[in-house]
Amino acid sequence: MRSNWIRFLAGVLVSVALVGAFAVTGGMKGGRSTDGLLYQASGLHPDGEMLAISGQTVTCEEYLFWLGMVCDNVTASLPDVDWSAAVTGDGMTFAEYAKTDAVEAAKQHAVVRAWAQQAGVALSDASTLELDAQRQQYVAYYGSEEAYLQQLALMGISEEAYDRILEDQYLYRDLYQAFCTPGSSLYADDATLTDYAAQLGYMGAYVLKLTGDNAETMANDLLERWQAAEDKEKEYALICEELQQTADGIVTLTAVEDDALSDAMSALEIGGMTAVIDPYGEGTSFVVLRTEPDLSAVAETYFDVLWNQKMEEATVVTNSKLYDGVDVGAFYE
């Protein structure tokens, strides 16, 4: 099976995190299909139900696809790997590692599907167009539609299952964009984001960066000018234009310990201003106006927190009869 695993899936990443304990059940379907190399290599029916993750079914076909990817990663570093050899101090073998890591890869995709279903988020029109364009790139790369489908067959995966895996990546992006877009159904309320920002010590600020021999003088002059301006945001934009700098708007960041610029910003009240002269000994000075954090930027990191939480809370149920019967060495060789 090894020579058939052609890795042309740029962007598909398999986590090395190991899966913890999960429930087992004998009530899942074993499947009937006998199509494809995956069945020949494993004896498992592609349409069999290998996993149920947060209500999403993972077929043997999808699981074995991820198992092959994990095995590819292992053999890239250890071409002559002994799948029965221990890889961890507690005796976990390379085969057990590969099987559990394949569960983790499937879990990531299943959690995306479950979250999108719960939130009512479907693949966007833009993502659908990108998927179509990506598929055409694959077809062009392999020379024809027939050649592309042959490559999928060599990988042992159906076009339907492969398309679903690709769709999950774009669906994750659509979830992220919806979550980070003010006004969308997924966007967290301002109070939640404000509390989260306070917990993590996020600060917001308009920042002017000045370099050159007269940076210190310019910083002090611009501070005085900016303080006198009635419309601070408008004045910031005008100064950036005069300095031929990009007006980046509010920068949202967390405090950094023992950092002179960060310390100066942290010391300011909201609306406070200061000039920070050459904090790093490199001749660069800064003028800073402290603001509330940009909540749209806070939402981006809050999404990551919720994603990790959903991954941790995901329920994983395995078809123990099928899972325990997977012989990694025989499957991959």
Tell where the protein language model's regions lie, with residue ranges.
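Acidic helix-start/capping segments at beta-turn-to-alpha-helix junctions
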Residues: 84-93, 107, 113, 123-144, ...
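Peptidyl-prolyl cis-trans isomerase
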Residues: 221-261
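FKBP-type peptidyl-prolyl cis-trans isomerase
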Residues: 45-76, 110-116, 168-180, 204-212, ...
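Non-catalytic accessory/assembly modules
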Residues: 4, 147-153, 157-182, 186
